[in-house]
Structures are given as structure tokens and as C-alpha cells.
Amino acid sequence: MAAENNVLITMIAHTTDGNEKDTTETIYPGKGYEKDGCYYLFYDEVDPEDAKVTKASLRIRPRHIDIRKKGAVNTQMVFIPGQCTETEYQTPYGKFILTVDTKRAEIRKREKEIDVELDYRLSLGGAQAIRNQMKIKVAEL
């Protein structure tokens, strides 16, 4: 993935909040390229209720992952195994502090595919942390 290529990004998220479990799968067409051992991916998230677009980018580094969003939601989440990171999470309803406690981040690269597995706890505004497990699959088209 040296030059910018069309990619398909599939995200499967498993969320556990107490006894409640939820799974969501979203698929985004996007663009991506590799530079200096990092992968940069760009895609649009469209809110199904009001069709507002949030521009999203995913940077996959050898040891951690960054997700940035700009639009209806503004944030930059950083996933570093064994560390807690804090960021502002700006929504139309206000600004919150988001804490990301990353337990695991695994990255596997193949010729035209990247697989990422994240296991992390998310806490919004000091509320009880919710366990999240996310699988991200990036396939070059």
C-alpha cells in the first residue's frame, strides 16, 4: 500500500456494559496509503438519522493506533497497550472528557490486508468504564 489506494474498512465492535452486550458492524469505503511503516486511512462516517458527515482518519503505527474524527463529532482517540489516554470528545450536545484504557492492540499485516484487534475500556465524563473489543479489517481494493 505505497501509493494512495481504495480500501474497504470493516469495523466490528463488541461492547459490554455490566450484563448488557452489543455488537455492531460498519463498513466504510475509503482511501489509504503507507508511509514510513505507518498506515494512514481516511473515510466518512454518515449519521443515519440526520445524514451529517464526520471525516475520520485511522493511523496504524507499529505499536499503537490513533482514530481522529472531525465533523458532527470531534475527537482524537489514542490506543496504546497498557496505557490510559484522555481526550476531548466534542458533540452537538457538549464537550466531554473521554478516557481510553487500552489493554491490548494487535496489528497483523499481509500483502493487501491489515487486521487490528483492540481491547479497551472507555469512560465518558468519569462514568463507569465500558469494555470494548474492536476488530478492524482493512482490505485494499
Task: Give the ranges of each region predicted by the language model.
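A short acidic/small-residue loop/turn micro-motif
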Residues: 136-138
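N-terminal intrinsically disordered, cationic/polar leader segments
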Residues: 1-131, 141
